[in-house]
Amino acid sequence: MKATGEVMSIGRTVEESLLKAVRSLEIGLFHLYDAKFDDMTETQLLDYIQIGTDDRIYAIAQLLRLGCDIDRIHSVSAIDAFFLQKLSHIVQMEQLLQEHPGDSKFLKMAKQTGFSDKEIGLLWQMDEKDIFHIRKQHGILPVYKMIDSCASEFDSYIPYFYSTYEEENESIVSDKHKIIVLGSGPVRIGQGVEFDYSTVHAVQTIQSAGYEAIIINNNPETVSTDYTCSDKLYFEPLCVEDVMNIIELEQPDGVIATLGGQTAINLAEPLRARGVNIIGTDCDAIERAENRDSFEKLLASLHIPQPKGQAVTSIEDGIRAANEIGYPVLVRPSFVLGGRAMQIVAKEEALRNYLKTAVEINEEKPVLVDKYIRGKEVEVDAVCDGKNVFVPGIMELVERTGVHSGDSISIYPTHSISEKVKETILDYTQKLGLGIGIIGLFNIQFIVDEFENVYIIEVNPRSSRTVPFLSKATGYSLADIATLAILGKSLPEQGIHTLYPKEKERFYVKAPAFSFSKLHGMDAYLSPEMKSTGEAIGYDNKLHRAMYKAMIASGIKVQNYGTVVVTLADEDKEEALPLVRRFYDMGFNIEATVGTALFLKEQGIRTRILRKPSEGSEEVLDSIRAGYVSYVICTRAILSGIHYEDGVAIRRCASENNITMLTSLDTVRVLLDVLEEVTIGISTI
């Protein structure tokens, strides 16, 4: 299994349900059409569909557009002809729409088949809004059917609805004041069930405040899609069209878009443009936090420093910006979640390669180039009511900047930053919450350099993935506090009169969980792009015991014996030396690739030399596969070439053989602290 999550859609036909599911996936596709298959021949497409992949269905749709016979597709793919006929019906509907632009009869047929306004607009060369107006003009509007959870055995009313284009509407609209909460959609790397935690708590708070609480979501794994959770549940795609249809029916007092992660917050501006009342942090505040120019101006006005950076719209602009800022630089596309396509580059050649191959860069899709500052990363989740700010806790991340915060071990309360730095962080958090205009939750990530200078990395004007962890660690239910603030109850009215409460005396540690052994092809090297698929928590009065518990809970094997395989980038060798020596002094056997082994031997550490694949041998891979290795330490220097390929092969081999893989020396340091604590006091844990 490779999937990290799933969506569910409900309709009256297979075609309708399938197309709703496709646009629920949030992969940038709104229909059974993927442009990457446009230039492939029928023969190439038939070869492609022999193997089951996540995008095979789009290749099959393209084959049907080319006129390929269903029986032939069935014989190649082994997909039942029943389903292929449904795909064929969708493709035939496309052709009918193209032949009858503007025809309301075919528009209704397309909507009953599950076509989105966006796709119909593309086929008719019209705007999505125009299709909506044509539908409204001809009365082509969805109705909502109730799921019968009792299979007609007896009458029941379960407030659990899906849309379809028929006649009778079964969703009875009440005259109560109501609030719609937008869910977070499918679980994927970068956006998990942490956001559903906030959604569910918000619904409970909305209900206790006397409102009718309505959820829109499409993920069957979540608590929010349990029909007993809210007053009404709409199981629909989180797209503007589908959400807007529900809003038109329910006429809510407001819509909350800041608790469902980036999925929900991306809907805020399109909904506002259609006259929807977005409550909590408004669209202007979201723009101030997420728009590069607006955010930089705000920071300058508040005298808050951030790493130098520029938004660039071409490759040459990117090269020029990096030369002005100075290498190394951190590059990433704007408006992403989970650090997708984010990298640290140290040379012009690597930057040019990144801008050519890793991202799409143009006027509409700028790429951010920032100075990379190596330092300690600190994170806060906070609540603002428009006049007051509350910071329940400050979290310190084990791994330095360069590792995505979602992949880093997180500690509350902080253990190695000074009171002066804490005061600065709290001051900046308060200024930013009020300056941006936050109403509800927000998250800030900071860098603290070796001179105790504090820089802002980013502000997320929404709930974050650390809200459940910090809520459990501090005892403050952040989602509840934030929801009451959104509904107009100030922090003092909630009994909160302080910026920062007294820290807990015990330590809470959040450790990431990875699925590298399942996700073949993914490099296990920790980087600015998030890769973890889960997390676990550990707590204890002693820091390293809390870390031990969190590591064990997250699936990390913590062994105080065995062999450590080491392969280091040249720039990491001096820093890694005392760490490897600590393993050696604890009785571990040390094995290393040639360059690393020679360095360690010169320093008096007995080391067995292993050759790499690029040297014509699989010694290092065979050693990892043999079953006696406890840890593999593998750091990375560059993003291409034989050394990089060797590193990928070593990391993949460790992951596939379920051996603890460490790519950050900060994680190695913490593991050694844990091993020393466990070895000395294991009986009391």
Question: What is each stretch, according to the model?
Answer:
Residues I73, I120-G121:
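Short alpha-helical "recognition helix" segments of helix-turn-helix
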Residues Q112, S116, M126:
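Hard-cation-handling environments
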Residues H133-K136, K145-I304, T313-R320, Y539-S683:
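ATP-binding N-terminal substructure of ATP-dependent carboxylate-amine bond-forming enzymes
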Residues M1-F106, T113-G114, Q137-H138, P142, ...:
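ATP-dependent carboxylate activation and anion-phosphoryl transfer catalytic cores
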Residues R320-V329:
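Acidic/histidine-enriched active-site and ligand-binding environments that engage anionic O-linkages
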Residues L84, I131-F132:
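Helix-turn-helix DNA-binding helix
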Residues E128, P142-Y144:
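Long amphipathic alpha-helical scaffold segments
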